């Protein structure tokens, strides 16, 4: 991580910029994950996942630097995951605004502050010279816990978000945003894709119920219990999804899909 700004042929990079040095044994890994991938049209078609250029995937500006001067720049090694530190900026007691950037951290913030009242802007707006996207959170001081400022600052800092304090709430159409009750559906038709959802929901700390497709058929009113139902991508057609995996014999018991005496 750059300790001070550095300027090379490819441009000027500010303090805090991340440098992946190529004078290390794992430089080939950086090539594979960060540089543009070129495929020869005469080669066999790639099999399975090939979207490995992480910069565009994560909307992070990533530049390959050929100027060796960058290796002499003042920098410090990062021991552990690189993490962006968020902040609270601005002055005001009316409330806070958090831009909707499409990051998962925005959703995490809502769930971490479940008892706080949030609203979402229905159109883009500005606070001073700064622009905010439609969907940005507006958190009023009035009607919220007295420790709102400290709690919001703590979570925004940890999640890498910027919360802007305002002395006047944005004049924009908005609606209340709660914490949706989520169900993730298990089906034996395809377990891999639902597993990716489970991994990410668990990593983000977003609560959900893990239910079987058989449960879905037995519930009289799903809307009464859940606001969002996630069904991972599966192959086949509507009929094969509805029927699921057939038994080998009539005597075969249901296949366990959670921890049990059999599994």
Language model segments and positions:
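Intrinsic-disorder/low-complexity accessory segments
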Residues: 1-263
């Amino acid at each position: 991580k750059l300790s001070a700004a550095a300027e090379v042929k490819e441009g000027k990079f500010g303090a805090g910029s991340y440098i992946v040095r190529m004078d290390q044994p794992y430089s080939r890994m950086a090539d594979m994950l960060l540089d543009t991938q070129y495929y020869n049209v005469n080669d066999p078609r790639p099999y399975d996942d090939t979207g490995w250029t992480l910069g565009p995937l994560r909307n992070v500006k990533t530049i390959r630097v050929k100027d060796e001067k960058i290796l002499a720049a003042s920098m410090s090694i990062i021991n552990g995951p690189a993490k962006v530190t968020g902040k609270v900026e601005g002055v005001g007691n009316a409330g806070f605004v958090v831009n909707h950037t499409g990051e998962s951290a925005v959703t995490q913030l809502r769930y971490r502050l479940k008892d706080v009242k949030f609203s979402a802007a229905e159109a883009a707006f500005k606070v001073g010279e700064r622009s905010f996207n439609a969907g940005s959170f507006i958190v009023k001081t009035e009607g919220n816990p007295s420790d709102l400022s400290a709690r919001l600052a703590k979570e925004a800092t940890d999640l890498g978000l910027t919360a802007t304090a305002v002395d006047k709430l944005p004049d924009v159409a908005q609606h209340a945003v709660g914490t949706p009750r989520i169900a993730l559906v298990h089906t034996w038709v395809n377990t891999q894709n639902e597993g990716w959802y489970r991994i990410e929901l668990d990593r983000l700390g977003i609560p959900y119920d893990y239910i079987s497709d058989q449960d879905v058929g037995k519930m009289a009113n799903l809307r009464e219990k859940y606001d969002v139902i996630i069904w991972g991508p599966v192959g086949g057609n509507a009929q094969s999804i509805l029927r699921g995996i057939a038994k080998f014999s009539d005597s075969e018991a249901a296949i366990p899909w959670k921890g049990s005496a059999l599994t």
